[in-house]
């Protein structure tokens, strides 16, 4: 599924028959379900890669808003350094039985209006007010998903 939400197509990947995965689109997870799951999740896992391709996975707090994922990190952390050289990223929720996986690219979010709104969102969701006044200490990344994978049961 792509995140052009109004024009998203639902495609069922091929599974081995022995897995008995339903081929009925009514049984597939809906975008509404995935969107709600992404919005309500507290801890997300991200995977980045170094310039040499070495993978790195880390848990982060984040905000899902308007089909974008936002998170903060220290620019000198492994994930911060990786993203400064390689913008490719994978984001997924913790629940392995009801999984939403995003693949895309991450760029620094610098729009003051968006950062002000995200600060409020962090406070509401985590009872935490971030300080993004100095990008040498914390940077906010915006993830633009290209591919969204949904796995599991919508009733999980």
Residue ranges of each PLM-predicted region?
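Generic structural signal for secondary-structure transition and capping sites
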Residues: 42-43, 88, 127, 148
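Charged, gly/pro-rich active-site loop segments
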Residues: 2-29, 98-156
